Amino acid sequence: MSGFTNKDGRQNLASCFNFRSSPFRLTVGERELKLEEDKNQLSKGLDPWTSNPTASASTLHYLLQEKERAQQAHEQLQIYQQQQGFGSFLQHRIRQPASRGPGGGGGGGDGGGSSGESTPVEALATAFGAGRIVRSAAGRKDRHSKVCTARGLRDRRVRLAAHTAIRFYDVQDRLGYDRPSKAVDWLMRNAKAAIDELPDRAEAPPPPAAASTEQPEATEQATSTSYGFGNTTGGTMTSAASAAAGSFLPHSLGADRVSDSVKSLFPSSSTASGAASAGHDEYRGSPPDLLSRTTSNQQPQELCLTLQSNQHQIFSHVSSNHHGMISSAGVPGWPDHSQRMQAWHAPENSTGDGRGGGNGDGYMFAMPSRQGLDQSQLFSHGEPLQSSGRGWASARAWLDPLAVAAIHHQPSTMAAGQVGFGHLVGGAGGGGGFMGFLAPAAQRLEGEEEHGSEVIR
């Protein structure tokens, strides 16, 4: 204790404190030395020729990694530049047709820029041009492509009819080919001579359009000749009747629009009255079987004039109290024609406008006006023309003025029994007799169906 209080003791304490502070100072110096040593070691480690192998190996590994990263970055940069260039090329090719077009804007600046992305389909379409069909990128078979021919693109696949396909596969089996195209090639080779004789498409003659227009006229002329009843001037009378047929049609119905076949059902009374005597003489001098001979040459399904052969089916159920409209009294020279023409009659309650009685299954016979027949007897009934539900109400507007005009224009000198046939298809063939003949189509008389009866239009 005394030592701590004296002077020496104080010095000892100071020495103790100095001793404690000395290690602190060494520690700071050591740290500075270590930093200098670390710097030296780092500077030595960067040198590959140093004696320290560990430091040199780590440095080389680091440098190699950095080099690989630099190469990868360079490759990515090149790929990006290539994509940029290809995208700009596509944009240029897309804008080029628009600038060439008539309404394309010629500006076409680089505004907006290219996205740098392109699809394989766009690239192929650009490379091969528009309108071409290219196989898929996977190289699959192109089963739906078309071939370019002289008349444009056509499908490669050909669809055959059933019987044609059966015959073709039979030929293929007989030839022993495994593919239909080989059989087609064989057929083309064997038919080469016939194919060479065919004209080219440009040299092929046009289809005869005039033949289709001349065919109805030839048919009409043949019909008028066969039903002219011995008239040598049937062509002239037919043309005159067709020219004057529109005079009886009302103007409101548009007579100029009505076809010649409809006009032929209504021959002019002036032409009929002018040729009444000639037609009556020709009709009188004709043989009794003229009707059967003239109608046998035509098809029953088309003209419906085989009334004589089918009269046992058509008129078998008509009542016996109906009087005959055509008799042999007014036509001398036909002694045996009265029995043959008995079937051409109309019931007593039938009117002059051609409406038959019964169940509505009647035939229209517009007969010449007799002496003493007034207009009240002609239009005794005001009902429209009917035929088994067929809409013939529109024909009333044609028949009424025709019948009235026939009454006013028929000469009084014509006998009541004189009968002449008006031309049914082409005009007035035999004079002022029947003004029309209409046979309704597909009528049934008590369960029996008429065969080959149609309406002559």
Curated annotation (Swiss-Prot):
Where mainly located?
nucleus
Q: Write the record's keywords in alphabetical order, separated by commas.
A: Activator, Coiled coil, Developmental protein, DNA-binding, Nucleus, Transcription, Transcription regulation
Q: Which residues form a coiled coil?
A: 58-84
Q: Localized where?
A: Nucleus
One protein family per Pfam: TCP
Question: Can you name a GO cellular component term?
Answer: nucleus
- Tell me the superkingdom of the source: Eukaryota
Q: Where in the numbering of this chain does the TCP domain appear?
A: 140-198
- Quote the function comment for this protein: Transcription activator. Binds the promoter core sequence 5'-GGNCC-3'.
Q: What is this protein called?
A: Transcription factor PCF7
Q: Which organism is it from?
A: Oryza sativa subsp. japonica (Rice)
Taxonomy of origin reads: Eukaryota, Viridiplantae, Streptophyta, Embryophyta, Tracheophyta
